[in-house]
Amino acid sequence: MKVSIVGITGYSGLELVRILNGHQKVELVSVHATKEIGTKLSDIYSYLKGICDLEIQSFDSQKIMATADLVFFATPSGVAKELAKDFIAADFPVIDISGDHRLPAAIYEKWYKKAAAEQASLDKFTYALAELTDVKGKKFIANPGCYATATELALLPLVKEKLIDVNSIIVDAKSGLTGAGKVLSESSHFVNVHDNYVTYKLNRHQHIPEIVQELKRFDNNLEHIQFSTSLLPVNRGIMATCYVTLKKPLSNEAVSKIYQDLYADKPFVRLQQDLPELHNVIGSNFCDIGFAYNPVTNVLTVISVIDNLVKGAAGQAVQNLNLMMGWDETEGFPMTPSYL
């Protein structure tokens, strides 16, 4: 299968290159961006020399459709909704890593502060949390956000079984600096991040409605969550610490069984006896989950960790590609995290 990437110079685009390079059933045939046109990708990123020496091309939907079988969009929000139109009209497969096709139009505009995609386009896309969504045969995939992936995987077993007061959910999520994107901002400047801990977009992060939307599918009583986002002085990784009030006390063994039952055949979700740590998933498509119950407060703390660029972006996109095509969902993935 031949694929193209639009938005190649961002972190998610580069991570797609790394993962697809090891995929035996996929060939990357073109990469596209708005700058550095005509330059070899490996001349900009020397670590790719001999691995991906493709020249960066300007965006041309017709050329992509003539040479590839599917296109990934690894673009900032607001871009894919416009550039994907030709592909949608031609019924040409798209996996959108951005947030442009995840939410209803009115909700997108409220949280992203941008005009939404056309309704006809939104209707084509399937929001695909890979562990829970059947995407075989689908052509248009809205890849979940990084914070949303970590939070949904942590909480869905409890919400699905209706074991918690869904309006008691509090999530304290922390991300490595790549989660803030490549464009430099005051909050991501080295001197403000190094040896520091920064909270940003408190109560305003655009992944909040995405999480509510997906959890609400399993318990319609859910109306809101309390959600905070912070930057860690590390390159990669997300840790979502979720606090929920149980409807009735549960033993750790009972909680563990609930998670095991849902994720038993999900190769990228690992339940840890100890509380998860970031470096155990870095460079991988794993989501590690652990928990601890406090019988005094009747609060269950669930912690999930992912690599924001892999499971939170490019990795889940490739996992969804595998599932779309009916391949083994682990196809192309190095199964060992880099750890250090």
Swiss-Prot record:
Can you cite a GO biological process for this protein?
Answer: L-arginine biosynthetic process
Which pathway, per its entry? Amino-acid biosynthesis; L-arginine biosynthesis; N(2)-acetyl-L-ornithine from L-glutamate: step 3/4
An example GO CC term for this entry is:
cytoplasm
Per UniProt, the keywords (alphabetical) are: Amino-acid biosynthesis, Arginine biosynthesis, Cytoplasm, NADP, Oxidoreductase
Kindly give the PROSITE patterns that the UniProt entry links to this protein: ARGC
Identify the EC number(s).
Answer: 1.2.1.38
Q: Spell out the InterPro entries in the cross-references.
A: AGPR_AS, AGPR_type-1, NAD(P)-bd_dom_sf, NAGSA_dehydrogenase, Semialdehyde_DH_NAD-bd
Principal location class: cytoplasm
Q: Keyword Lyase: yes or no?
A: no
Its UniProt entry gives the catalysed reaction(s) as: N-acetyl-L-glutamate 5-semialdehyde + phosphate + NADP(+) = N-acetyl-L-glutamyl 5-phosphate + NADPH + H(+)
Protein family (similarity comment): Belongs to the NAGSA dehydrogenase family. Type 1 subfamily.
Biological role: Catalyzes the NADPH-dependent reduction of N-acetyl-5-glutamyl phosphate to yield N-acetyl-L-glutamate 5-semialdehyde.
Q: Which NCBIfam families match?
A: argC
Q: Which HAMAP family match?
A: ArgC_type1
Q: What is this protein called?
A: N-acetyl-gamma-glutamyl-phosphate reductase
Organism whose genome encodes this protein: Streptococcus mutans serotype c (strain ATCC 700610 / UA159)
